């Protein structure tokens, strides 16, 4: 069986965009690897007390991601180690730790390490516009393409790379 590696920006993106693909791949016996750029620290809070949850939102969303990975049959989940950039035009966009401000070569290098380790048959990430323009989704697309370009120059590429809408 093969390996499917997906690159997402935040916890919950895996469910919203590719949950069905991930579960089916797992059910068919494929290895499923999820790379998440951030811990979703700037996400929206719908069903919890914002004042008490906001300071620990990254922890909350990391736990939600862990549970999601269990349900979807993810074999390995790794973070790239960046901070959620928030929506375009927000103050969080200016945080130097935010994903969308990360140097492309640095972030692509981090992803390339995981790609080298896994040698996936299929890689999935966002369209160039990040599906709806979120700065971290756009960055995830560019980082994935740059990492794949880097590895192709080293003589390797996955059998297929897909962009999800």
Features from the language model and the residues they span:
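Active-site rim/loop-helix segments in enzyme catalytic domains that contact anionic ligands
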Residues: 1-118, 145-146
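Short, well-ordered beta-to-alpha junction loops that form the rim of enzyme active sites
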Residues: 80-83, 125-129, 135, 163-165
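The feature marks non-catalytic terminal segments
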Residues: 1-2, 150-165
């Amino acid at each position: 069986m093969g390996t499917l590696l997906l690159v997402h920006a935040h916890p919950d993106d895996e469910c919203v965009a590719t949950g069905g693909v991930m579960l089916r791949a797992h059910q068919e016996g494929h290895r499923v690897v999820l790379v998440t750029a951030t811990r979703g620290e700037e996400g929206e809070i719908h069903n919890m007390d914002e004042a008490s949850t906001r300071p620990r939102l990254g922890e909350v969303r990391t736990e939600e991601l862990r549970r999601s990975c269990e349900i979807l049959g993810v074999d390995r989940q790794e973070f790239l180690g960046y901070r959620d950039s928030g929506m375009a035009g927000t103050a969080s966009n200016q945080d130097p730790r935010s994903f969308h401000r990360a140097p492309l070569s640095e972030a692509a290098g981090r992803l390339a390490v995981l790609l080298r380790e896994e040698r996936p048959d299929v890689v999935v990430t966002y369209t160039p516009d990040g599906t709806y323009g979120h700065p971290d989704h756009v960055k995830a697309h560019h980082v994935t393409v740059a990492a794949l370009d880097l590895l192709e120059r080293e003589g390797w590429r996955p059998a297929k790379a897909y962009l999800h809408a």
